[in-house]
Amino acid sequence: MSAAEGPLVVGVDTSTQSTKALVVDVATGRVVASGQAPHTVTSGAGRESDPRQWWDALCEALRQCGEAAHEAAAVSIGGQQHGLVTLDGHGEPVRPALLWNDVRSAPQGHRLIEELGGAKFWAERTGSVPAASFTVTKWAWLAEHEPEAVRATRAVRLPHDYLTERLTGQGTTDRGDASGTGWWASGTEAYDEEILGHVGLDPALLPRVVRPGEVAGTVRDSHELPFSKGTLVACGTGDNAAAALGLGVRPGTPVMSLGTSGTVYAVTQRRPADPTGTVAGFADARGDWLPLACTLNCTLAVDRVAALLGLDREAVEPGHGVTLLPFLDGERTPNLPRSSGLLHGLRHDTTGGQLLQAAYDGAVYSLLAALDLVLDEDADPSAPLLLIGGGARGTAWQQTVRRLSGRAVQVPRAAELVALGAAAQAAGLLTGEDPAAVARRWETAAGPVLEAVERDEETLDRLAGVLSDAAPLLERGTGAG
């Protein structure tokens, strides 16, 4: 390892499937060491994971970082949002954590919306209408199905909170991750006692919300990690807010993440409240807001279409007239949970490459429609769209986003943006800088800019028309008679 120019910090991304750790030079942003270890997630009706796995994975990831991790002066945890972690009086998990993608609590979500003033109430109070991913619905599900677990619970945490608490011995969270629970009021930036009372959750069980820039604590003696006692621990945040930090995005800069699911978001200084539920009104990790919309069908759905056609994912061909809505897992944006994929306009001369391009078009159309709802009216339409995630380096994805958005597209070279965002937050504790400014100094968003091209209005109009005409069929789903 070459000598670092400044102090070292550790940024962690504890995601659904694995924990990744980066040791970063504060002066330059250079990653001097990294490590990664997997988690397991249950399959079947629910999606659960033992939080103790996350700790073991963190220990292993840091072990892989070697001596560099021992030299770190500060650490921060970024993590998967929404998960419900229930702990007993000794800090041990009462049961496995209910993860963000465990949708068994959908009925409880619908009931909570009805019981507490409707969607408008929730949007105005918490910034979001609670979907099955939100923690409040998971607590309601647990109270209904496993009341003995609720009775045994002495602390309620989010995934990143659990790891932070094991480092410091103190129960803390941050505004970014708290805003995805459904029991944090975005208007007052405090826990909502009415909502907590309605779901029977004692606020004393919840962690203290640490303000941006505040130290969450220091590393305590009794731990298994390579940090020295007294190493600073930042408050951490949820994965989307951490990625926004990792990019150093300024208000109004649009971000599109292409993964198994697709995500669009932008930082804004206006508190969002969308009663349709399309846009989640999250807080960011700095003091601003992070309106975000998500689609369920993105890279995995398009790859499935390519596999069915026997084509490489880049083997697209231009073609006009065929439309494919790749809603293979139902869809959240637009809100069509019972939908399936829909193909329209197939003719004798339609090629496999044209069908594959139509799948890309359908996936990107949904994301761009959501982006229009996320951006402020005064956002700069000429600002490049930051394209991140696993699909961002694919030529077919890049060209489809350019053609349908009419925007310039920038593809950051930096990877592991959640861990980099956590590292920037940790660095801010040492230097006093805004973490987003740290990331900009590190030039994490630097990458090739693809110039804007004329927007393909014909394809956009065709997609909008097919979606509108087919909405009753898509809403009914394949199981209805």
Swiss-Prot record:
GO biological process entries: D-xylose metabolic process; xylulose catabolic process
Site feature (Important for activity) residues: D13
Residues reported to bind substrate: Q81, H82
Keywords, sorted A to Z: ATP-binding, Carbohydrate metabolism, Kinase, Nucleotide-binding, Transferase, Xylose metabolism
GO terms assigned for molecular function: ATP binding; D-xylulokinase activity
HAMAP family: XylB
Annotated function: Catalyzes the phosphorylation of D-xylulose to D-xylulose 5-phosphate.
Name of the protein in question: Xylulose kinase
